[in-house]
Amino acid sequence: MKQGKTAVAGAAIHHVRAAILILSACAAYPAMAQDAAVKPKEADAAASETVDPAASGTVLKPITVESGGQDGATRGYQPISTTTATRSDTPLLDIPQAVNVVSQDVLKDQKAQSLDDALSNISGISQSNTLGGTQDSVIRRGFGDNRDGSILTDGLKTALPRSFNATTDRVEVLKGPASTLYGILDPGGMINVVTKKPQQVFSGEIYGTASSFGGGSTGIDFTGPIEGTDFAYRMIGEYKNVDYWRNFGKTKDWIISPSLSWYGEDTEVTLSYTHEDYSVPFDRGTIFDLNTGHAVNVDPKIRFDEPYNISKGSSDMVSVNIKHEFNEDWTLNLGYSYSYNEYSDNQARVMAYNAKTGAVTRRADATQGSEIYNHAVRADLIGDVEIGGLRNELLFGASYDYANTLRTDLIRCAQSVNFNIYNPVYGNMPACTTVSKADSDQKEVISTASAYVQDSLYLTDQWILVGGARYQYYDLTAGKGRPFVTNTDSSGGKWVPRGGIVYKLTPDVSFYANVAKTFRPQSSIASYYGNLPPEEGVSYEIGSKFEIADGLTANIALYTSDKKNVAYSEVIDGDTYVKTAGRVRARGVEVDVAGEITDELSMIASYGFTDAKVLDDPDYAGKQLVNVARHTGSLFFTYDFGELGGSGNRLKVGAGLRGAGRRAGMNNNAYFLPGYVVADAFAAYTFQMERPLTLQLNLKNIFNKTYYTSSIGTTNLGNQIGEPFSAVLTASVKF
């Protein structure tokens, strides 16, 4: 059990006091002042990478962030344009597909700490099996899982277990099929985490946080030009040491990320590097009793594993992005990234549960010497030309991806019944060191090469046709064991088309429709069924987009997506295998709104209805897909009081709700995770010192609601629990 809560609270207060004193000193220290030509307001704007229209009497042009050759911009909470959907800088209303953006302002106001936090603002999003909280795992429009390749960084696939960190500027979500431009993906869509890039105006921030759980974090973010050169730099660093909210565990993480940009007359080059070390709890959550259909009646803080349930590792990512403008009509974007993640973990895995006595059967497992590395290359030639008197936005592209995953030593020990959830005693099951030769050397290697083309044809000022196609070639092998046994060995290619149409009723209102296909080769390190057939999908979508009073952007979409040969896991004799369902379908309605209602009042809101079920399968026909919420919703308002009483000090407050409906906990729908709604709020006060000092208090899950975010899907023994009430105090100074 966790000890010394009073001491922890005292330590948290000490962290806050120390941070405030240090930041106040930095704010007042004249030696920290930079070029006098850079005004504080300009520095602040560059730091947030958007311009707040409420900060002055006029609406300023937003700063466009160059993100790996992908241009995109937001204004406060409002998305303006994106390159994720078309790979060229396109207004949202010209895109025949739903696109959502969680801006930097939203992330800062809500103090988002994970991709799940950011995506709680987007419709139709649920959490899937996170492998004990160690991986990003996101369901989009009914489809998705961990390690499914749907989460990109600056438009390129990576080996990162978690893509959201201190380098994140914003999160863009492209709904529906994206295979034509991004390759092997589900029809539910893809997520692009856009990172912060060097800016040509100096700005900086130093911050510290304290959590009510215990511990906190500290970090820096500085960017600006290198005097006398055409270069700009950025340096981001953060150290985090926070107590886990359950009865034992700690999250430790440090990250450093330098980047350098060169701005020539026609060419821009950005080189970036990010290193991260992490140690996080490996926590599979709680048990649901199949007799009652509810979680076991145990304090949610009580864990059923051991203190050695930890995943430790480090990751590195190097990326190079080049943008060259041949002339006003033609631009070449080149991108490359190399990413590497190595990790090891230990866990006391719950294998069975006795509902009458509360006794659980556990097994000491571990994965040691795991590594994943990924190369991703893409080249896009973009043209904006007239052909036959009609405007065409042309895209010719090619890409190559290589991913190699190896889990070296798989450790498996004998099962033991030595733990009771109603009287937990830890330490009776030591970590295991016995290597299972049959399970070790799990390896998957996939390489893909693609060429694609797309045209956005502007027939008139009102009608836009979008069409494209991709040829996708892949080579895939997977297997395990000592000696190694190959269970998957396949290769092939396929054309993947897309088409869409936009009708702009007015410059601020558009209607659209699209149809697209997807293709995903599948593998299994262990399958009773040999080579798995590739997933194939098709999706249809209609919708409308609005810009309201030049401040709010809204999107309404209706869609239906069908997939066949969908992979899912099942347990056979205690081991997990992969098989495929015949056909599944997801249908739904989504509404998203983001932006400014007035100069002072901003909002971001969403609602999604998703009906996802198995249509054709001998075992699960008619069943709901695991972890897919039938209803999702969020609503968050902020109010900026502006300058108070002529003092120069500013106050900003906000509050909102987020929630999801019930979700199937297992493939056979033996139980359901209940729906939930939780409330959050924040207040930020900025003192106008020589450098602005901001104190921000974020309250999460204000009413301390017990809720469950996802299940592992194959059994009732692993269900993630949402965090209880927490308070995070942040002190930051900007330069």
Which residues are covered by each model-predicted region?
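Membrane-embedded beta-barrel scaffold of Gram-negative outer-membrane proteins
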Residues: K323-S337, N341-Q347, K504, F511-Y512, ...
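Outer-membrane beta-barrel translocator/receptor signature
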Residues: T167-D169, T180-P258, W262-E268, D316, ...
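Acidic/polar loop-and-plug regions of large Gram-negative outer-membrane beta-barrel proteins
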Residues: K240-Y244, S257-E325, Y340-I372, Q415-E444, ...
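Gram-negative outer-membrane beta-barrel transporters
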Residues: T560-D562, T580-M666, S732
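Structural signature of Gram-negative outer-membrane beta-barrels, strongest in the C-terminal barrel
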Residues: S261-Y263, I372, R391-A403, Q442-K563, ...
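Conserved C-terminal beta-signal and adjacent last beta-strands/turns
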Residues: S370, L394, Y540, V626-F735
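Surface-exposed extracellular loop regions of Gram-negative outer-membrane beta-barrel proteins
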Residues: D277-H294, Y402-L406, D475, R498-E541, ...
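Acidic, small-polar-rich N-terminal luminal/periplasmic segments of exported/outer-membrane proteins
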Residues: K61-V201, I542
